[in-house]
Design a protein with these regions (language model features):
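Sec-dependent signal peptide recognition
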Residues: 1-7
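Sec/Tat signal peptide C-region and signal peptidase I cleavage site
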Residues: 5, 12-18
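N-terminal edge beta-strand
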Residues: 17-32, 67
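Short, solvent-exposed loop/turn segments enriched in Ser/Thr/Gly
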Residues: 31-38, 93-97
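Non-cytosolic beta-sheet module surface loops
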Residues: 41-45, 87-89
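Short acidic, flexible loop segments centered on an aromatic residue
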Residues: 44-62, 101-102
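Intrinsically disordered, low-complexity Pro/Gly/Ser/Thr-rich segments with frequent PxxP/GP/PP motifs
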Residues: 56, 62-92
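Terminal connector regions
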Residues: 89-123
Length: 123
């Protein structure tokens, strides 16, 4: 039984989502005192449609930010979302990672019980 379960887990798809570029760079935005960068989220998971965007420091503590359209994104299967991330100039040295995390629908029957988290490191 254990061998069968291990075989099923090993043969399953390891598809997640993708966040590019891998190393985004913060540049001055059109808003004074604010830095911005552009990332693209690609959804490779058929069972997931929603992703949460976050910005963290080197210790994975949250950093204040704003993303275009809010921090929860709906991305269809094999679709892309272009996201502009804005960070205060005073927080640019703290901001280390831009991360996206797949969100499972609450109360719905899910094929997947696994949430994926992908981060890009800010240069």
């Amino acid at each position: 039984m254990k061998a069968l379960l291990l075989l099923l887990l090993a043969s399953g798809s390891a598809m997640a989502h993708e966040l590019t570029p891998t190393y985004p760079k913060l540049t001055p935005s059109y808003i004074p005192g604010v830095m911005s960068t552009h990332v693209v989220l690609w959804n490779a998971r058929q069972d997931i449609s929603y992703y949460k965007v976050d910005v963290f420091d080197a210790n994975m503590n949250p950093v204040s930010f704003i993303a275009t359209g809010g921090n929860l994104k709906k991305v269809d299967y094999l679709g892309r979302a272009h996201i502009e991330v804005f960070v205060r100039e005073e927080d640019q040295d703290k901001a280390t990672f831009i991360c996206t995390e797949s969100k499972l629908k609450r109360g719905a029957a899910q094929k997947s019980l696994v949430a994926s988290k992908v981060c890009s490191k800010i240069k």
